[in-house]
């Protein structure tokens, strides 16, 4: 996957090189600064300045060598316009951009266009030869008729380069699309979008293509047979789609230098002719359903193939013998091939240039791992995870160029050999998930090493923590039995960014240097004392987890200096403090967990307005002593939780903490959190960025549940149980379309269960037990599929799954009356927020009036 990204970055780099060299010699090539035009005609200069004024350019980097304007030497007309990371605002259909009719090359990459769709007026720029709009966040091509003529490119017959990658385009690609009329195209990139359709055979009409990238979309079905027409193509990227069928017919594409088909569903065998292509240097076929043996012709010894990834397939027969003929290989991935016999690494000896090897998930011959065996001395990175290895592979002892070793998830016991630390280039060591219990020789051997990443997770280490290398960047020792105090020497490791010592037996206080790091996890130890109040201004701290210890005192106010903080968990300690309203000043805080401490007092702001925390996604304050009621507008400002699922575009809360350009791998840190979910206590080892959860259970909160909770469309789990909430269940719960778990048990709620809860199609768990609810449980919905105990303790409830039948089951309960009475409570709290400060009462009255008469209209206008 990482190689795919690198390849696509290279692809973009080639595009930019093309942009630099395609300008005809008749052009005036003196680049005009973005800040002012001195060589173009006055009218063109004015038009450009007008175009700039349509956007916010405060963050534009005027020193960026990419940004600029070129003008024709004879006419003075703008012919080349390049602006990246510069423009913020809406690209409108009447933009002055579309008045530059002489434009040949237009690159507006990585800007912040807030417009959802691409204006069709691009088609008026009919002299364009290059159009690059990658990474702009466009999400809609409906106004450009993606399924039809695609007006964006209808008249752009001279276009040679088109890059619309890394946006959010969706829909299907119709064979009649005018895209396929661009017969001059040499470079086409639609990668990283959401286009879902079969691959039209008319791609074969674009027979001048040299680079084609359709990766990371939803293309399905068989690869178009006319691909054999693309005889000029040098780079073909079809990664991460859902393409099926036998291997594509690419035997005519003899100019290929890069062929990427990974993460699809291709089946059959790998054709041997690939290894005869004279220019092929990269072949990526990972994660398909390919089978059979590999046949490499003897003539392939002159092959230029340097990178070959075949992992996660079903290859059979002798694998390494034919591969050993590809003597120019530098990177080889044969992971998880499901072979039925042990693989002998000695067969790699002809590959003298091999620097990267991944054999994970395969059975290796024990003899081939001994010190008497041979693998290329050029090896820099070796991955042998899940290979059933029982002894430390001594074959590594001779690899003086080794930088990265990964032997995770094997069955290796005993101590780590001392010779490992004598390898002069060793920087990345991951030996997690084995049974190591110590280190040969003195643990002080670490100190002067060049090791930057050291991962010791899930082993049997015990005793004091070893002294870490001075060069260490990331250190993780999760799930071991280390004891004693956390050594103060870690405070002297000035490069240390990530330290994870969770799930050990450390005692004593937390070191004072927490703000030196970016990621700190001390969860589930036996630490005591208070959290150090030593976070300095502009601290880079992003994640702090000290849950499940014996910490006391108050939350340190110096956390306010950590403007990058995204994750804060102090759950299951003995912290005694009031609710930290002051944390709302942290602009990036996504997760706040205060569960099971001694926090007390109200959680409503002193002015009784909305709670802050605009980016908050997960808010856990269960099992404390919080009191008071929640004002109606309590949830209005929770903008992140108001997003729909995945609307923020992320996947997991994953942070990269080693970004060195020469790193053979990228190490990341993921947050862990405990949740009460679907009535169960669950530990989430990876937290989705789109996940939103609230847990107020086990406190002393009272009053009505605010209707504004219905704004939090991203909510997946909501737990308000074991409080003293009164009043009716909010009708706005019906807006929580992603809700999966809802617990309101153990309160004093009255009235009926709203029918709207039955429309929540993802709701798999609900409990309203032990309240004062009455009436019939909504029938014919997922609610009736719940267990009986979810509704017990409500004397007035009847209907399935309870045994109590309603008075007259033939007549449905009259719930609309209550809902009509409560409709005045269904207020659009976004409107309340707009006019909240000076005129709360007036705003509530107006919102009440509007919502009562035309709620659908109001919702449409505001966008919920």
From Swiss-Prot:
Chain ranges on the Extracellular side, renumbered to this chain:
30-830
Task: Give the record's GO CC terms.
Answer: plasma membrane
**Name of protein:** Receptor like protein 24
Q: Where is this gene product found?
A: Cell membrane
Q: Which domain of life is it from?
A: Eukaryota
Membrane topology, Cytoplasmic segments: 852-864
Supply the source organism's classification. Answer: Eukaryota, Viridiplantae, Streptophyta, Embryophyta, Tracheophyta
Similarity section: Belongs to the RLP family.
Keyword annotations: Cell membrane, Glycoprotein, Leucine-rich repeat, Membrane, Receptor, Repeat, Signal, Transmembrane, Transmembrane helix
Q: How does it sit in the membrane?
A: Single-pass type I membrane protein
The residue ranges crossing the membrane are 831-851
The LRR repeat units are at 100-125, 127-148, 156-182, 183-205, 207-229, 230-253, 254-277, 279-303, 305-326, 327-350, 351-376, 378-398, 399-423, 425-448, 449-472, 473-492, 493-514, 515-538, 539-562, 564-585, 586-610, 613-637, 688-712, 713-735, 736-760, 762-785
* Signal peptide bounds: 1-29
Glycosylation sites recorded in the entry for this protein: 61, 73, 94, 112, 176, 194, 229, 252, 298, 338, 433, 448, 492, 505, 561, 719
